[in-house]
Amino acid sequence: MRLPQVLPLLLALSLLGACSTGSIPVTDQSHGLWQQRQAPLRDFDQWHLRGRVALFINEEVYNLGLDWIHGRGDNSLTLEAALGQGMVRIRRLGDAYQLSTADGEVRRADSAERLLRQVTGWDIPVEGLEYWVRGLPAPGSPARPEIDASGRLKILQQEGWWIHYLDYDEPDDALPALPRRLYMKRGRVRIKIVIDQWQKAPTRQYENLFPDFPG
């Protein structure tokens, strides 16, 4: 199921110039704040986010809706193309991943990124994004973080990706400060992510959200 190209968001076109940044000085204070932030973010492993993705691959642009439930019993990522052009869901099943489409196609593999690319042509690093979207380096591979004065990730280089953290939500009593806008690039692929809502834990399952969508 290869989905057709849709028109780009005008806002995303202005983002290229907004992502240029110089090196960020690291002070003892900011480094200490960064060290303090990492444990609460790792412990924040039950969450539900909703947002939007603008995906640029060569000359093609896709605008996608994003809904991601990450809980101890369920890890389900749903991407829906604009204008009703299609929907896919990726669910983690132990050490493997299952991809389902709205028209009933189901595939399994040990790589979510490869599954998504094979079925849709989209190049989205799902496995790393599970950590990057919270403002953390993914474990198990070298990373080069740059942090801001508040001890938050400003730029992260990992697995060939450059991840720019453009904005954070303000922390409250229930949640730590979490990314709100990210810009990512690797080769000819550019991804803009806007997170509209964070929740501390899933409140309902996808079976209730999309009752007609195959599991």
Where in the sequence are the language-model features?
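Gly/Pro-enriched, hydrophobic low-complexity segments
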Residues: 135-215
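N-terminal, post-signal-peptide region of Sec/Tat-exported proteins
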Residues: 58-80
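A short, Trp-centered hydrophobic/proline-enriched beta-strand micro-motif
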Residues: 37-59
